[in-house]
């Protein structure tokens, strides 16, 4: 039984209450009585409306299901569009407008660059991400497949000089392209110095300067013998580290020991899809790490290579400007926080009727209270120098739900004494009803919006669930080539530019999900800035370092200017449904699809349920590591549910596949000492039961979301573990 403290009609888990009282409130300028009174008022005012919005989702889905049962996949798109307008799914588009968001940090409003998303419950990951503002290009190239392991350039255990030479050559070529010298190459540089406020590069007696002297930002150390020189292109900095005593610098003609990229400009500290937070214990862990990030004192100590390492937040970088004045560059990524959406409740707080409080309301109040340690009256201003708090709000369906979030944020600001519109909003364009009404969604948050982002993973899950009754969907791997997805990606950019986001907000693109395949990422992910996105998601600090090179190659502001005049993507294309009109899959095709989906589901769910790990690199059926979170789970589970519903596969076939793939997942996790095998005790495995629920009850899940099943089963597993621990203790 959870120990609770009752205040103003709220029954708060003692763990959360004590955390707020002892750790969060001191230093914010907000007194405890005001905080709890305001939280109660917000909960009891807004919770009924939150529930009404969820009921509207269900009502619209029921009408769409009935329409598809009568019509199947629409051959008459005009009739389908008219139906969606009639039921209020597709809303009238209002006149053109421009967003008016103000007090936005340049990392969001002005500079294009990579964005990390990291589970805030993992302090080490969170610190690594925050510190990924800067990343070693040498390390990123040497340690990944970005440099081929051919012609003697294998990674191996020790340092390979041949591989090192290829890394240095790659980096010098990058410098030649990004920050060119006048009539010279960085490959031939012998010495760097600063003379008369300009960078001078010597070449054994000859000298060259930058083709564009304005690219020189500053240096540290002595002008005649700097420790580093800092250059810039498209607003992104590059630090050339000079150290002739360093193992690399000592062998380099110019003494260059490293090239350090400005990499993850922004990081989303995630309380949502990449975490498993089901109760007060979990929420306190998430909030405590967010608190440490906002106060600047988060630390994590761990063992690495037999030594104890303590990780903390990096300090700002102090430099001398070309004119001799002191300047600072931020040492950390600008942090946003992703709250949960409108769907879930959490037992951490109960309302006066004993109902669990909507988790999105709880997140808004607690993450904002914590942010006061950065932007409040006594705040450090070490995250947002502009004095704003950035909240990414996921999984909203249409402008009415965005307006509800805007009202929630306003209520939180009033409660905490924040100026109006201090809390900025990132809108995830990952639900179909938001996509088709995107302009009106942005209008609803026009004073707060700092971010729109296509999340094609969740968006595909919603696509499948919305049109579940239309027919069997095409194979999952074919989705990226479907008509709707290309239109969706372009539509997001088109609408964002139309609404004036350029120069004020981010227009983002989705995740590169293969953290080990960096050569492929370097080749392909440049498509995101070329498409007009001024940020895109990457799975690791290393990936951020490499993806940053794309923003040197592409001037996103110029791309956006060019795109403003193109013809807008077509609504009809977005509304086209990816059903297989005449499926002709062979039994082998079906088996492969089923195996792939089932293995992905089990590989992710078993860690979520048994270990509380919400985001991890899960080997796929071909043992390629993929970053999995609830979005990928939503697609896979909905896809099997769809094929089951339309008779492409049978329940027996699916169950046989799930059991067979459980053995594959067990073998893939054989090296994990904390792993609990699924097979052969399928009935006893809560994780296996959760995976089966997601598939066999997939049509019943609200909008195809996985959270209700995952939360219920994780709570069951935690209770089982506590019971087992108590039994062990009594025996001991």
From Swiss-Prot:
Name the record gives this protein: Malate synthase G
Q: Which HAMAP family does the UniProt record give?
A: Malate_synth_G
Please give the GO cellular component terms listed in this UniProt entry: cytosol
The similarity annotation says: Belongs to the malate synthase family. GlcB subfamily.
- Main EC class of this protein? transferase
Q: Which GO terms describe its biological process?
A: glyoxylate catabolic process; glyoxylate cycle; tricarboxylic acid cycle
Origin species, per record, is Chelativorans sp. (strain BNC1)
InterPro entries attached to this UniProt entry: Malate_synth_C_sf, Malate_synth_sf, Malate_synthase_TIM, Malate_synthG, MS_C, MS_N, MS_N_TIM-barrel_dom, MSG_insertion
